């Protein structure tokens, strides 16, 4: 059953995420009268302009009791990541860490007010880890949705010169300053499913595929060599990979004016892809129902 608290956390989290990635306008007089000034809470374009802080055992006062997450990741004072670390010698350490994260959010279906929801208004990633293992998810995830991150992109495993544990791969692949901010800005979507909003974070293969596609579009200068194939297994997130690619292209000064055309070979997939795009991003979506429609849309100057 969906609880009111869960709705409040998710709606607030989505609002804050939108504020972070789309910036805000503040009325201010800089000598030429009061005007709306764009304020970047986070500078996504130049990561070094931000302040990054990792705090161990940070105590937070909750309504009924304090909580002390093992690690909180702050960017410009905002708690954007929470990591729970468990001993590998306890029973089911990964599940125990996830259960602890659920407790912090008051998501254990307990009548006790045992956590502090306000911490997760800002949260973008949650990690449970023990020894060399680690899994990541978002605030809407259940245990089965916590997944490993197996790629240190833009580095390859051979580039790093040593065999890395899954925990080290996740840290290298997700928590470099550039990748952390890139994931927050371009690889998170909020999608309605079965009457509730689900927050989704890209998987490592989607992140890599989008970056390689962007690199080819920008750096290959022979048009016929810009194409390629991204291979997915069934159920591995093809639609969301396309959404993430479209979002990242729209944020890139060199690619934002491109017109994107998505072709499908099945009516069901066509409907699914249209719904996914409509539900997860704010760009104009035109659904061509015939060849004539498609030709007319292509003739338009807009980058829809």
Task: Put a short name on every predicted segment.
Residues 267, 288-297:
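Conserved helicase motor
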Residues 1-264, 268-284, 301-303:
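ATP-dependent helicase/translocase motor core
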């Amino acid at each position: 059953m969906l609880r009111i608290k869960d709705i409040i956390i998710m709606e607030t989290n989505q609002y804050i995420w939108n504020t972070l990635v789309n910036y805000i306008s503040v009325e201010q007089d800089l000598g030429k009268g009061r005007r709306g000034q764009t304020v970047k809470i986070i500078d996504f374009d130049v990561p070094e302009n931000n302040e990054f802080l990792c705090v161990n055992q940070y105590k937070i006062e909750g309504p009924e009791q304090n909580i002390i997450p093992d690690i909180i990741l702050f960017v410009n004072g905002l708690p954007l990541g929470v990591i729970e670390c468990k001993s590998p010698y306890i029973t089911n350490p990964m599940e125990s860490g996830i259960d602890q994260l659920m407790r912090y959010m008051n998501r254990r279906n307990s009548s006790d007010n045992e956590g502090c929801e306000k911490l997760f208004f800002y949260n973008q990633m949650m990690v449970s880890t023990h020894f060399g293992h680690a899994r990541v998810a978002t605030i809407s995830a259940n245990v089965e949705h916590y997944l490993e991150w197996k790629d240190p992109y833009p580095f390859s495993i051979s580039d790093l010169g040593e065999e890395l544990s899954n925990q080290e791969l996740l840290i290298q692949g997700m928590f470099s300053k550039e990748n952390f901010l890139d994931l927050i800005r371009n690889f998170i979507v909020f999608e309605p499913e079965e009457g509730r909003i689900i927050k989704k974070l890209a998987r490592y293969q989607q992140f890599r595929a989008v970056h390689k596609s962007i690199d080819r579009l920008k750096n290959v200068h022979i048009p016929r060599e810009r194409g390629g194939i991204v291979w997915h297994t069934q159920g591995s997130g093809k639609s969301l990979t396309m959404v993430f690619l479209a979002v990242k292209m729209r944020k890139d000064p060199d690619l934002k004016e491109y017109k994107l055309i998505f072709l499908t070979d099945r009516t069901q997939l066509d409907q699914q892809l249209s719904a996914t795009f409509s539900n997860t991003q704010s760009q104009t979506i035109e659904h061509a129902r015939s060849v004539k429609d498609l030709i007319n849309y292509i003739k338009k100057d807009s980058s829809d």
